[in-house]
Amino acid sequence: MKILTKWLRAYLPGLSVDDPQLAEDLTLRGIAVEALFFVPTSVGKQKAQWNSVFEMDITTNRVDAMNHYGVAREAAAIYGLSVPDLRFDLPKPEHAASPFHVRIEAEDACGRFTARVLRGISIGESDDWFPGAEVATYFELLEQKKINNAVDATNFAWLAMGQPTHVFDLDKIEGGIVVRRARKGERLKTLDGVERALDAEDLVVADHARPLALAGVMGGWDTMITPATTNVLVEAAWFEPMAVRRTARRHGLHTDASHRFERGANFHAAPVASALVSRILLANGGWIEGELVDVRVAELEARTADRKPVALALSEVRRILGRTEDEEGITGTTVEGVLAALGCGLASQRVSESASQHDSDAAWLVSLPSWRLDLEREIDLIEEVARVYGYNRFANTLPAFGEGVRALPWAESEAAVRRTLLATGFHEAIASTFCSAAEASLTAPQPGLVVPLGNPLSEEAGVLRPSLVPGMLGMIAGNLHRDVSDVRLFELGTVFGGTTEKVEERPAVAFGAAGSVPEQGPLHPARAIDFHDVKGAVEQVLARFQARAVYFDRFPAEAGLTPAWLHPYRAARVAAEGATVGWFGQLHPSEAAARKLKEPVLVGELYLDRLYKLPLRKPMAREISRFQPVRRDFSLVLDESISWENIDQALAGLQIPELVDWRVREVFRDARLGTGEYSLLMGATFQAKDRTLREEDLQSFQAQVVEAVGKAGARLRS
């Protein structure tokens, strides 16, 4: 916004610094002057003059400084000056036959509404009607369009003191004023000429027959001021910020009034602004009929204007702000001077009954000014002390830190997973924590437990991700579509479940691969990546934890247990310690087609919360046996419903120290086997640490192995 320095100096006659210095000092105190430029102006036959204008960048929490008086108040605090209270004397009102009636029905959205009746007003072009304010010059320099003296008076009020006001043609109001919600089917033609269908949540200023204005946003066409207007109703009110924001957004409007009401206006400024507008309108004749009508809602007034005092201790100010370059540092007098200059009231109090009278024991109960809604806590007051005192006056010191850095409970486990996947050829990537509702329903482990966002950025980012898979698929597709043929990615992150009221978080890792495995020498040429490559990476991750029972299994497609994003016949479940810890396999063809992926993509996800509860497996050195190992092969026949994991678990339960290894050598399927059966060649290695195994030892071990696999559902092939 633009601030005219001539107008500022009208409030601060004792200000002696030049405009560039003023701009620098305001900027250092957080009231940023983005640019200082000089504008020539010539009004009438006067000689052209150069006037300086500040281009300000006021943060949204400082609505009190979005006007000339507010910036003058900041300058007064910086230089130790006093700024006069805004008071506008009006002529004594004439007696009204009956007082103007105002009623607030929407007590949750309108805390105060003032109305003043002016009669005999002449509507025309604005003259220099306000003492000390050359209106034509001011408006020209600030690029403010002049309309007529009534509308210009309301614009002058918000430029001067930041309080939006509105003027109605009184003769077009039926009965009194009612501040209420719009009713079904009501319509309102606003000052921009647009006829709007009102929503039941819209806040309106109405008379006894129809809506007259969108409260705090824009006035209505039917009651606007025209050259024929002689009787005027001046409105100055306080509207609840959220109510104004919602109404403005629904109708796609952003006005000077809504900009200020949305950020919180000064509850006590309404009567002052009303007096300012009235004084301007009465400059060319007319009179006031009746006293100012001032209707308030006690609950909103207590919440916004009459807030509880905040306790502030000098010791806390010094602890937070640290050492200054001045030897004396921040004193009680400094704190009192800064806060008083900002409009705060201070009541001194002792820290405790035994507190001494030293300056370090100073403490106050600070009453907050009604125009500073951004001040709520002790830390806010401390920030104000630092800001006005000057950030540049504090010494450069490092903050003290008394506690050690504590890592997350699973930091070591997470690092182990990361190192393992990096070592197996994967690259780490990071995706958004949001996804679409469709992706969430497809990949959520528990489909009903998806957490929607209250204010989503877009439909594609409408829920918290219940799985890392959507982000992983997006990253793989993005690489493949950009001619990156060989992709291996993983992401370590958090997934979300539960409900909006109780969101549950759990760590997870997703991984995806496509393309080929690079050549690893003449005996290992490049080849397409397959299911077993990904399975090997999963095994490496699981091997880092001391999980006793780790196995992989798959379910018939008819069972419907495989996640919808995986190929029903090319996927596996990962289990550890008797619980599911993840899934992996080839991406479902329909999902691949939806993402325009022409080559097979392998993807998976592990839920790490269960694994993180297990201790990490520590590398241990063991003595290598000096005695010869002996391998025995077992040709087994199994039903298709029995997997290798069943055999693996059966052998793991054997109490045979000499059984040091067992693994699949070959899988064979043939019609000559029984229906629904397959053959598996298993190799078992026996080795003792203290002797050479004899034939009778091996026969005993073999018998135990055959018995164990038999209990698991396998039989020796004849």
Please state what every model-predicted region is:
Residues 1-354, 358-410, 415-417:
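RNA/tRNA-interacting regions in translation and RNA-turnover enzymes
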Residues 2, 10, 19-21, 341-343, ...:
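A carboxyl-terminal module marker
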Residues 32-39, 82-84, 283-297, 394, ...:
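Short beta-strand elements
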Residues 140-146, 259-266, 457-461, 513-531, ...:
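Short histidine-centered catalytic/ligand-binding loop motif
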Residues 178-218, 222-225, 393, 398-507, ...:
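Class II aminoacyl-tRNA synthetase-like tRNA-binding/catalytic domains
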Residues 268-284, 475-488, 699-707:
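His/Asp/Glu-rich mid-to-C-terminal helical/loop segments that flank catalytic regions of hydrolases
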Residues 287, 333-349, 362-366, 479-483, ...:
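Long hydrophobic segments that form regular secondary structure
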Residues 299-318, 368-380, 405-414, 441-449, ...:
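Short glycine/threonine-rich loop-to-helix capping motif typified by GTGT followed
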